[in-house]
Amino acid sequence: MQSKWTPYPWVCFSMCVGVMGTALASPLYPIYQQAWGLQPSHITQIFVAYMFGALASLLFLGRLTDRFGFLAVLRAGLVLMTLGITSSALAWNVPSFAICRFVIGVASGLITTSASVGMTQLNNKGDLQRAAATTSLTIAFGFGLGPVVGGLMAQWLPMPLKTAYLPSILLGFLAIYALFQVRIPASTSTSTGGLSFRDVMPALSQPRRPFLRHYML
C-alpha cells in the first residue's frame, strides 16, 4: 500500500526544521546575558560547544547515512535536535546550556548530511543541480527563520527563554511523526549489517564532480 506521505517535501521540511533549531537561540543571548549575568567568555564557550558537536558529527558520524540509510539517520537527528531544544528551554546555567548546544550541534550534522543525501536520492529526475539548489535554499530559509521566530516569541510572550523554543519543539514533533509515516523506495535504503568501528572513523573524500560543481555555483 502506497503511503499518502510523500517523502521529498517532508525531507525538505525536516531539514528546514532542523536548521531552524540550530539558529533559534541567536536573538536570545542578550536575554541570557541579563538573566544569568553572562560574560563574553561564556558566550564563546556556548558557541564552541555547538561547533564542537557539529564538527564531531560531520567527522565521526558522516558515514552512518551510508550504513543505515538517510531516513533512519534523519529520524535520529531530528529526535536528538528536539531533545536538545527541549533541554535548552529547561537549562538553568551556562554548563547545562552548553551541553544542550553540543547536542544540537551533533544533531545538526546528522540532519544536514542525511537530508542532503535524501533529497538527492529522492529526486526522480536525477537533476543534481536542482537537488543542490533545493538544499541550499532550505538551509538558508531555516537559518533565517530560526532567529525571526525566536526573536518574535521572545519579544511578545512571557518567559522568553522557555516560550521561544515552543515553535521549534512543535515543528520537530511534526517532522518526526511525518518521517515515521513516509515510505521510501527500496533502492534508496542502504541499511545493511550493524555498526562497525570503521563507520565512526573520520574520512575525507571529494564529492562527485557534478555535485561539487553545482554547490560551488
Write out the residue ranges for each language-model feature.
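Flexible cytoplasmic inter-helical loops of multi-pass small-molecule transporters
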Residues: 183-203
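Paired small-residue
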Residues: 84-87, 95-104
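Extracytoplasmic
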Residues: 6-40, 112
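Helix-breaking motifs and short loop linkers at transmembrane-helix boundaries and internal kinks
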Residues: 37, 69, 90-96, 158
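Cytoplasmic helix-loop-helix junction between adjacent transmembrane helices
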Residues: 100-139
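Juxtamembrane helix-start elements in MFS-like secondary transporters
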Residues: 7, 39-47, 132, 136
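Helix-loop-helix hairpin linking two adjacent transmembrane segments in secondary transporters
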Residues: 125-183
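Central cavity-lining transmembrane alpha-helices of secondary-active solute carriers
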Residues: 45-63, 112, 116
